[in-house]
Amino acid sequence: MRAFRRAAVLAASLSLAFAVPAIAQEFPLTSGEYVEVTSVTVDDGHNMDYATFLAGRWREQRDFMKAQGWITGYEVLANINKRPGEPDLYLIQRSKSLPDGAESERRDQIMRDKVKMTSAQLEAASGDRAKFRHVIGSSLLQVLNFR
């Protein structure tokens, strides 16, 4: 009986010894929300023009997207200590997941209906802003949360 007890204690100890490394090997980060970052420069003398667009139509569209549950938040960040070649602004948009192609098209149609503009009109408006606003890059990032 005593030998059996020792064997049981030894078996339990060994199983714990092997279980601890398995727990320790679990990746310490989990996938979080997606963050879309658009890098923008604005020509001198047009900061008010672009700020007015951002505070108006851009913000209205983001508020609608948030109300629909498509995004979780958005913000505009200014590059305070800008170096040559860097953007003036970063437009940030956060979402829990990314839509597939069909869902993306569905959302685009809902947005066009909301703003009462065709794709051609939206492109023309973007072209008008491109006279003083320049998108110099974009990134899609994913937040990594600690366990």
Name each model-derived stretch.
Residues 24-28, 77-80:
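Short beta-strand/turn micro-motifs at beta-sheet edges
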Residues 30-45, 89, 102:
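Acidic/histidine-rich, surface-exposed loop or edge segments in extracytoplasmic proteins
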Residues 43-90:
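N-terminal, post-signal-peptide region of Sec/Tat-exported proteins
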Residues 146-147:
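Short, solvent-exposed mixed-charge patches
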Residues 26-29, 60, 64-72, 92-142:
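An amphipathic, aromatic/His-enriched active-site/gating alpha helix that lines ligand/cofactor pockets
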Residues 18-24:
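Sec/Tat signal peptide C-region and signal peptidase I cleavage site
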Residues 1-14:
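Bacterial N-terminal signal peptides that target proteins for export
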